[in-house]
Amino acid sequence: MAAAALLAAVDRNQLRRVPILLLQPREWPWKHRTVKYGTTPGGSITKVLIANRGEIACRVIRTARKMGVQSVAVYSEADRNSMHVDMADEAYSIGPAPSQQSYLAMEKIIQVAKSSAAQAIHPGYGFLSENMEFAEFCKQEGIIFIGPPSTAIRDMGIKSTSKSIMAAAGVPVVEGYHGNDQSDECLKEHAGKIGYPVMIKAIRGGGGKGMRIIRSEKEFQEQLESARREAKKSFNDDAMLIEKFVDTPRHVEVQVFGDHHGNAVYLFERDCSVQRRHQKIIEEAPAPGIDPEVRRRLGEAAVRAAKAVNYVGAGTVEFIMDSKHNFYFMEMNTRLQVEHPVTEMITGTDLVEWQLRIAAGEKIPLSQEEIPLQGHAFEARIYAEDPDNNFMPGAGPLVHLSTPPPDMSTRIETGVRQGDEVSVHYDPMIAKLVVWASDRQSALSKLRYSLHQYNIVGLRTNVDFLLRLSGHSEFEAGNVHTDFIPQHHKDLLPTHSTIAKESVCQAALGLILKEKEMTSAFKLHTQDQFSPFSFSSGRRLNISYTRNMTLRSGKNDIIIAVTYNRDGSYDMQIENKLFRVLGDLSNEDGYTYLKSSVNGVASKSKFILLDNTIYLFSMEGSIEVGIPVPKYLSPVSAEGTQGGTIAPMTGTIEKVFVKAGDRVKAGDALMVMIAMKMEHTIKAPKDGRIKKVFFSEGAQANRHAPLVEFEEEEV
């Protein structure tokens, strides 16, 4: 049966929305006193509104449910069928997909809180979580804001102010400029005085937005303007500060909690050094290689920082640390962090429960001496992104999604299910995989084992990248720093990854067996004795025969000569190498598995066939093998875009630097696109003259839409 006919039978519209099994209440494997709580907070919180979406909304709802607190969700039009909407006791629409019209619309959220009789609002992280005006708005309306007072958000949210407060409190700070003169000339002058490389950062917000490393005076102006645009878009404030950039530092942060009674504690540190685009990708607790004395000094400095602003609730004090374990205050995030689960795993706490109880007026549940530190935990952030394309964020449907089974040491923190869509309007994080074990090496082995079980089809993800990262010898040794990915780029992002011929044989076997399944199904339903499907069995007249198959790895076609043997096995020849192949397909728990033997080596893989592509997932890794489609069935090829540039993803055109008639050189900036809350510069692929610009500033461009056309060059 032709591969094209087989593919036509795969209907991707028949997606099932499959729920994710989440972590059950943990039974701690180490012998230590676990804190017992009552069923409801000591204050008046019986209903909480979560002013957020995705996995953090689901996370808060689970704890609220455990405590007997009713939950209220809000959602945009894009999130109407989202997981957090289904989980909540009540859910209310608050507007269109763009965040400014929904999740950042303070008046709408306050109105929902009032109409639903919610006594408190949990902001999650991002969106309004560090918005001083929103915290004050809640207070004025008599609604409990589950977070610090607005004054603490103000003091810590403006980085220039926080640096001064920290210095006065005896917290070490980095040399830099935090002044009010925000002219380009003044900032450039101070950068020169501090000495390159420097880091410029938006004085508000976080998440790597509005942040640039500048290594020379030559690139200062371009990077400053780009950082200002991104900061203005994200935080509505383009003011900047400048700091001396510490080369190859570690990013170490401390979880703190304060209450209304003047108490403050630290729950040890997390190492979040390994980052891309200044955003964390893998975190661990405790930080590797930190001795107890440094850990104590870190924690005490973080508590001093919290007390300096009368902090209440969950917060994170971030430090940069040099190779000698000297540390310097960087900023304080006045909210619950994305990576808070690793702290929960090593301390046996529920930090969301602590938030709710402290917001209701209770004291911190444990004294500093009572907070345990046991074992080691990792969190890997699973993103819809393409690591091979500078970690370009992606969007699209989760056609297939299967995860490792949650257990007492494995958590899946997510807000999506199979069949859901990763939206272009929001952050592309799919899930957080969190694991715990008694020591770092065991936890790392658990992380890699679990990543192998995280299988996603429908859009590109960073799972394979995380496997390479967690398996790198320097990462295993704990030699982490913020330049880890650039330093080990060749190991982590190999340019040419050739699929093993044995894996190609497995893919070919899976396709052949799938063809046999389909032809058998046709045979059962046809009455036409002359139909080729009425007698197709993979063999003819009980004799061997040979066919040629073509599969594709990247842009390279692979020719496989397949001989069907009478005993049901296959001889496959790729180039000059011969393989004896046999196996079968089976269904387990709703998934198709390929059991195969290639030259006597047995293996088992999950087998998925979708959209001209074969996906194989096994404990050895994952592969994708394409099935070439005849040219007369193919859409316009990518070569048709050589005369210009195309949009790498769906987004909004923020700036246009060129017009028709302009001459440009390869690498010149043509446009700036905002997508997935990040700024992407579209650069000229070659020297030439612009013939046409297809989009103006503010316009929405779909993925692969032509942006700029070049004039044809005379030969």
Swiss-Prot record:
Acetylated. One of its GO terms (biological process) is L-leucine catabolic process. It catalyses: 3-methylbut-2-enoyl-CoA + hydrogencarbonate + ATP = 3-methyl-(2E)-glutaconyl-CoA + ADP + phosphate + H(+). ATP binds at K159, K201, G207, G208, H251, H278, E318. Residues 622-711 form the Biotinyl-binding domain. Biotin-attachment subunit of the 3-methylcrotonyl-CoA carboxylase, an enzyme that catalyzes the conversion of 3-methylcrotonyl-CoA to 3-methylglutaconyl-CoA, a critical step for leucine and isovaleric acid catabolism. This is Methylcrotonoyl-CoA carboxylase subunit alpha, mitochondrial. It comes from Rattus norvegicus. The gene is Mccc1.
